[in-house]
């Protein structure tokens, strides 16, 4: 699943291509919004909120309220801009079948240039009033890539407080909960735990200062939001040296040469959470085990 840095880069590319343009065609290929007519509407901006994409639109005439076209990349979603796919560590940039198109937009710049944006395999496509965006994203915790992060210490403080609120909860589950803080996915979950020398199954109370973890997560997402290939090692380890533990089960730890282990962690007490695979070093991250857990039913928004 694309993580917060990938979504932020996707939004930046869409914003650069579409902000200020007027829609000349618009197809929303989802039943709920299939009859929406947005021709003539102007794209004001495209902004991320955690892992959600918010395309804000201004009506062509006075009267109707501004609207937001919301989408979520989920596991396989991607936007193509003028036929070019986003390249990232999270997504395949190869061709996509036409029957997976969910949004197809063409737009005109003031100078007459045309732009096209096509969304493949995106989920949760919905059109709503911009004033009502919180109906879809209000449940999210502080966004690690919020533009106001450096100027507003309350964002960092709230994220740290959210993490600390359930001291017995495994840190590897708390970090992945978008209600706690938004932007971290499975890759960053594994990498952050390794960098903090914390076992993913360790309780929050034993995982060190939550504020320090939040700071590290913020720095890593900022570092990678403009990169096609995500790097958490500093990029000094050569080929196949971008990550410390994620996806490296059975390979040597880059620090101690122990074998990286693959485990699973689930939270049955929360409806809709599923067992998610993670990776860790048993020596650098000594702690409780991560036994396999059966998936539970879907339900909670991510």
What is the meaning of each model-derived region?
Residues 15, 145, 149, 218-221, ...:
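Short amphipathic alpha-helical signal-transduction/dimerization elements
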């Amino acid at each position: 699943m694309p993580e917060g840095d990938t979504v932020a880069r996707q939004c930046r590319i869409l914003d650069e291509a579409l902000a200020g343009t007027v829609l000349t065609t618009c197809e929303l290929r989802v039943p709920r919004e299939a009859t929406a007519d947005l021709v003539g509407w102007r794209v004001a901006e495209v902004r991320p909120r955690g892992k959600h994409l918010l395309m804000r639109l201004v009506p062509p005439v006075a009267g109707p309220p501004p609207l937001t076209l919301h989408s979520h990349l989920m596991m396989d979603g991607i936007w193509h801009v003028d036929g070019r796919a986003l390249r990232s560590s999270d997504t395949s940039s190869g061709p996509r079948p036409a029957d997976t198109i969910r949004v197809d937009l063409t737009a005109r710049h003031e100078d007459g240039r045309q732009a096209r944006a096509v969304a493949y395999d995106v989920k949760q496509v919905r059109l709503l009033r911009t004033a009502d965006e919180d109906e879809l994203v209000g449940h999210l915790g502080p966004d690690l890539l919020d533009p106001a992060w450096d100027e507003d210490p309350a964002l960092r403080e709230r994220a740290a407080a959210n993490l600390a609120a359930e001291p017995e909860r495994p840190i590897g589950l708390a970090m992945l909960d978008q209600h706690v803080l938004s932007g971290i996915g499975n890759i960053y979950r594994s990498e952050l735990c390794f960098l903090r020398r914390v076992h993913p199954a360790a309780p929050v109370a034993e995982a060190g200062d939550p504020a320090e973890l939040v700071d590290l997560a913020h720095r890593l997402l900022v570092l990678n939001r403009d990169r096609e290939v995500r790097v958490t090692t500093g990029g000094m380890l050569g080929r196949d040296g971008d990550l410390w533990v994620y996806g490296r089960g059975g390979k040597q730890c880059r620090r101690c040469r122990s074998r990286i282990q693959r485990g699973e962690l689930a939270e049955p007490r929360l409806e809709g959470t599923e067992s998610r695979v993670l990776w860790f070093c048993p020596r650098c991250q000594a702690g409780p085990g991560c036994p396999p857990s059966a998936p539970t039913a879907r339900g909670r928004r991510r």
